[in-house]
Curated annotation (Swiss-Prot):
It comes from the Bacteria. Belongs to the RecA family. Disulfide bonds: none annotated. Can catalyze the hydrolysis of ATP in the presence of single-stranded DNA, the ATP-dependent uptake of single-stranded DNA by duplex DNA, and the ATP-dependent hybridization of homologous single-stranded DNAs. It interacts with LexA causing its activation and leading to its autocatalytic cleavage. One of its GO terms (biological process) is SOS response. CDD domains: RecA (cd00983). InterPro entries: AAA+_ATPase (IPR003593), DNA_recomb/repair_RecA (IPR013765), DNA_recomb/repair_RecA_CS (IPR020584), P-loop_NTPase (IPR027417), RecA-like_C (IPR049261), RecA-like_N (IPR049428), RecA_ATP-bd (IPR020588), RecA_C_sf (IPR023400). The gene is recA. It comes from Proteus mirabilis. Keywords: ATP-binding, Cytoplasm, DNA damage, DNA recombination, DNA repair, DNA-binding, Nucleotide-binding, SOS response. Its main location: cytoplasm. SMART domains: AAA. This is Protein RecA. GO terms for cellular component: cytosol. It is found in: Cytoplasm.
Amino acid sequence: MAIDENKQKALAAALGQIEKQFGKGSIMRLGEDRSMNVETISTGSLSLDVALGAGGLPRGRIVEIYGPESSGKTTLTLQVIASAQREGKICAFIDAEHALDPIYAQKLGVDIDNLLCSQPDTGEQALEICDALSRSGAVDVIVVDSVAALTPKAEIEGEIGDSHVGLAARMMSQAMRKLAGNLKNSNTLLIFINQIRMKIGVMFGNPETTTGGNALKFYASVRLDIRRIGSVKNGDEVIGSETRVKVVKNKVAAPFKQAEFQIMYGEGINTYGELIDLGVKHKLVEKAGAWYSYNGEKIGQGKANATNYLKEHPEMYNELNTKLREMLLNHAGEFTSAADFAGEESDSDADDTKE
């Protein structure tokens, strides 16, 4: 339907005035191409990048990663930092829990000499530091570990046992309103690590909830639920964890997909084993009995030996990684089935993760 000519002139004048006053791009038609392509940073796990749909975590947005203790939350964020640093990006880690291990971070590939780190005294201080870093426009990734440790100043200065109902939630709500716009303008990725608590008296449905109120749930573009689902053993020795990540909220692609990978103790995400699994799934790696082959060349009997072969032959690892990324990430935005890369998720699982 054609718009009246007088209305078109009035609209053009209004848009011109808005752009003159607030800057180019402050208002645009939704179909314009300027904001449609989301820039992302890899998580370090190919299957999780595919599950996220856009090929990684979106820049200029807020992301929440939550799960039980020792599920791999901090490890995953350190892998994101390592991925970003390999691309020459500047990263910051706000260590509210005062528990960051620099030696472990270094083992995961983090350049600790160029990682900005802060151990704030109060929750307000931590969030002000986040705001200052995002407004600078120089920092690409900020990680806050964790929301549960962001203690309001009034609570720190008060007595143990004093009631501070809703104080942390109000602090987070105010911070989200302030941070969201600044992150978009500076194209900074802000990741909040969060812990799980149990709602008391819940008889039906999921009793789990996250700390810090509801504001973070609403402002987060992506929410990831990370769980340890098993152990990786070498004989009787436990050397890692089988990990599942569910994308419970996603504003940049289809939600409710999931990815599974191994986190090896002291090493991080087992990208080699992940490539073997994805290679077999997508018929780039052949499996006959216990033997794995790539391009007609046998690379090992059993997954452990095939994984070690890839470690020892980086050129083969890079070739397989490139092929899988081209195959999977080119179609990641087309809302493919989660079964293509991680195993199917039941309807009940999806229902449990709804907010």
